[in-house]
């Protein structure tokens, strides 16, 4: 199904061609002056230079051939050469009916199906999720869902940090606390216990204690470094403890990500890439791609046209150790072998841009991926407190993500209880859904690369561009539709008819943008575009709701059209919030 912009453009193109002008000038956009018109074409301005004519003459010529076109209720030329367009209400109603009957409301991605790896989450084993993990999780989940909606085979990978020094620190701290465990008995030859020697709460306390100790105790730090090397070299006891750490940590991380409505297809980590590293680096050396510099093994990534000097990618340190770049490159080797992706999308703090530039260029230069491989980095900004600095607890520490969620749930709960008469249990359940929407929408409504201020009072408000406002709009529509069916009405086979007043047409005009918005969000990895759209639709619906008595409309044909229109509105809003991984309660 073509978008409304494409359909209007087709009509304008035909006339530009008929008048002897290149159809490329017939570009139509949504009007940036909705007080003047609904759509516009500024092509006559550009065509004037090519054809050495006054732009208004070209615009007049085109408009003259379109005045009787049934697609338009008004089309006019405005000096110096703009073409202003309003769409016919009957045509608009027909388009909306086709949307409601078409899969994905008419959205269609013309590209062939791709296999897309979305690398997001960024969690570390043995560490709790904190507020710094929020953006990668919620933006990544939305990008993954948008890609799936676009028809791609999408694979989301949490890519755990599970192979670094934190493992050695935990192993040695555990040795100091529980030296009697068989892992620390050099003469032990039996099977190690299946039960982990710690709980998740103990594990989360062990790591920071060990990290602090390593800063003050050089001998302990050296032991931790040695334990890390032993783990990475395959030591049986260290590997057994590591497996316990991973089992306990993954279970807790899955629970916390589930609470965020974030779900991964793969739970792989840096450890999975380790078997590929030596072969990969040695091949780079043999192929003349990598060379030794100051004891380290590096790959030059500078390219002609770069406006600044870029440092080489270090793939092996002077002591033989691998780095994050090495692990990320080896992960690409594994992904190429197992999944054959067409596209890679990585989500991380925008300050990691150089790192991913190095990794992508090295992967292409070394032949790990094709030279024209589609590799994208979506860098996000920081979630800040009201002081404009990275969000902290009141005591200045890093806040755990589950505590942040609890805080916003409580804020929403208090608003529900103060404004409505509702049972506490229902209020708590509703607050959990709405609170998560407040948190996620507050993040996703910002362009990913921008920093934003976390304001619990604003995010939890039921007014303005917020998650609760969007959900309240959907719940309001659900309530109207429920009352309609309870009174004997049926929503089956209802048709939208031509709008008869402004707010009705405004809602219709907002809904027809759906396919264009989804296409833009998909191509730009930009969930905030969906947020902008659903806020516009919600405002348009509420304007329509306040201007019209939907259920008490005496004209039955008009009432049926209203019900069909708001049913489509609800369906589109629900589809959009699902792409943001936001759920909606039945009542609020």
Language-model regions, residue ranges each:
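Short, charged, solvent-exposed linker or helix-capping segments at domain edges/interfaces
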Residues: 94-99
């Amino acid at each position: 199904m073509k978008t409304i912009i494409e359909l209007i453009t087709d009509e304008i193109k035909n006339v530009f061609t008929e008048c002897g002008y290149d159809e490329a000038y017939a570009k139509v956009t949504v009007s940036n002056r909705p007080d003047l018109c609904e759509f516009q074409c500024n092509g006559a301005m550009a065509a004037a230079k090519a054809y050495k004519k006054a732009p208004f003459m070209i615009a007049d010529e085109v408009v003259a051939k379109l005045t009787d076109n049934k697609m338009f209720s008004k089309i006019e030329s405005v000096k110096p050469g703009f073409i202003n367009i309003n769409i016919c209400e009957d045509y608009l109603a027909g388009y909306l009916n086709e949307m409601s009957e078409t899969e994905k409301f008419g959205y269609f991605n013309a590209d062939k199906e791709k296999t897309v790896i979305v690398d997001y989450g960024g969690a570390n084993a043995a560490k709790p999720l904190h507020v710094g993990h929020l953006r990668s999780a919620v933006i990544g989940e939305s990008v993954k869902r948008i890609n799936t909606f676009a028809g791609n085979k999408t694979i989301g990978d949490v890519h755990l940090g599970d192979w670094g020094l934190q493992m050695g620190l935990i192993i040695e701290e555990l040795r100091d606390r529980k030296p009697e465990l068989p892992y620390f008995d050099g003469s032990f030859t039996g099977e190690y216990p299946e039960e982990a020697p710690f709980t998740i709460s103990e594990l989360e306390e062990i790591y920071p204690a060990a990290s602090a100790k390593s800063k003050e105790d050089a001998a302990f730090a050296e032991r931790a470094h040695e334990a890390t090397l032993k783990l990475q070299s395959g030591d049986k006891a260290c590997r057994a403890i590591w497996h316990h750490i991973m089992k306990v940590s993954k279970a807790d991380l899955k629970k916390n990500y589930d609470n965020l409505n974030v779900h991964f297809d793969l739970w792989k980590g840096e450890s999975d890439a380790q078997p590929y590293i030596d072969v990969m680096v040695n091949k780079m050396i043999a192929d003349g791609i990598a060379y030794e510099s100051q004891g380290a093994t590096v790959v030059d990534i500078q390219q002609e046209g770069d406006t600044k000097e870029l440092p080489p990618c270090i793939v092996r340190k002077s002591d033989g150790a691998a780095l994050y770049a090495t692990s990320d490159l080896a992960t690409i080797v594994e992904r190429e072998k197992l999944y054959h992706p067409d596209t890679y999308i990585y989500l991380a703090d925008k300050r990691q841009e150089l790192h991913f530039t190095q990794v992508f260029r090295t992967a292409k230069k070394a032949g790990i991926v094709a030279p024209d491989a589609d590799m994208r980095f979506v860098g996000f900004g920081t979630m800040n407190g009201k002081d404009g600095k990275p969000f902290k607890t009141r005591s200045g520490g890093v806040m755990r993500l589950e505590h942040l969620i609890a805080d916003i749930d409580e804020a929403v709960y208090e608003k529900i209880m103060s404004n409505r008469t509702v049972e506490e249990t229902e209020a708590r359940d509703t607050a959990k859904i709405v609170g998560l929407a407040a948190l996620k929408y507050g993040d996703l409504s910002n362009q990913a690369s921008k920093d934003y201020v976390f304001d619990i009072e604003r995010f939890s408000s039921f007014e303005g561009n917020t998650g609760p406002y969007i959900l309240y709009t959907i719940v309001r529509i659900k309530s109207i539709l429920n009352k309609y069916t309870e009174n004997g009405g049926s929503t089956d086979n209802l048709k939208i008819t031509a709008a008869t007043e402004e707010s009705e047409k405004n809602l219709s005009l907002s809904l027809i943008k759906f396919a264009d918005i989804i296409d833009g969000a998909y191509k730009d990895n930009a969930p905030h575009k969906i947020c902008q759209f659903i806020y516009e639709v919600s405002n348009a619906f509420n304007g329509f709701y306040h201007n019209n008595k939907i259920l008490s409309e005496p004209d039955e044909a008009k009432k049926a059209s209203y019900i069909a229109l708001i049913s489509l509105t609800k369906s589109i809003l629900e589809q959009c919030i699902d792409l943001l991984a936001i759920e909606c309660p039945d009542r609020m």
